[in-house]
Amino acid sequence: DKDDLRKIVDDPKLNPEQKSQQIRNHPAIVRAEKEMAELTPTVDLPNFGSKEFVETRQFNVAGKTLQGYEQGIEELYKGGRKLAYEEMGLAVPINVLNRSVKNQGEKIAIINIGPPAAGKSAIANPLAVKHNATIVDPDEAKKALPEFAGGIGGNAVHGESKILSEAVKDLAIKRGDNLVLPKVGGEVDKIRTQIKELQGNGYKVNLVLTDIDPDLAFVRMNERFLKKGRLINTDAADAYRGKPEITYNKLKEEGIADGYGKIDTTTGIGEPKQVYEDTAGIFQDTAIRLRQNRNYGGAIRKDAGYPEYRIESGPKDGLIEILVD
């Protein structure tokens, strides 16, 4: 069944919409979703939240077996400090884990929203490196829990991973870190509340939308399942469909965040990305390769008070590649 699913995902003759239609109700997906549904959510365990549970909870972070929430949260925090460098294949600077080195400048938080498998990490990682920021990602907390079981237990640990990531975020705020927060962004009220909370803690908050065709995101989600064993229930993915963009547009209309950025993640990691909007120089001075059409229409503000992107020459009406070192 998985081999057949892989053929669909890899078929160059099918567009994302056609692949999406064939993937839905595929036997391999139906079977995996059934297995997921049979697992008990960890937040429903009889002793969840008890003193004993908190003190004896098992974690595995970066190959280290840990016991207790205190150790687990501290190790997840350290992982969030290093994550961007490790995923980008960069050496981790010494000061990244040096707690005596405090953030002396303006505190920045970037909330990066987009559907599952939208390629948020391709944007979040360079932004985290730019700002020496801690990435707080519930998906990283999921991996640390034994019930995750390589991915099939993603739903079972979903609730607990959110609790853990909130604790990691609170720790990072307490330590004055800059933050990058990848989220789906399916609920406007939750993102609005998050922005206000961060601003109340002295952060300048930028909201970033990773924009992608919903069918392509769905295909990538199932491709990730084949490669890594991680699966998001189809019904849940459908429930998120189109919601991050609604959230972005609504909050931009309200003007609640301090800056807004919208970037297309249709292309793969390392390939040039199309910027549709950047009101605060969010994507400037990062390792993200950007591209821009000359008939772009001014989506990047020219009066934003920061240097314009360095543009390399290109054909008159074609794409102009913007390289940001």
Model-derived regions: residue spans:
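Conserved nucleotide-sensing/catalytic segment adjacent to the nucleotide-binding pocket
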Residues: A133-I135, E140-K196
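Hydrophobic positions on the alpha1 helix immediately C-terminal to the Walker A/P-loop
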Residues: I123
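Conserved glycine(s) of the Walker
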Residues: G119
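Phosphate-binding P-loop
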Residues: S100-E106, A172-I173
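Conserved GTP-binding G-domain of TRAFAC-class P-loop NTPases and closely related GTPase folds
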Residues: V219-D325
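The conserved Walker
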Residues: P116
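N-terminal pre-Walker A segment at the start of P-loop NTPase domains
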Residues: A62-R99
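Conserved phosphate-donor/acceptor-positioning beta-strand/loop module used by diverse small-molecule
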Residues: N201-M221
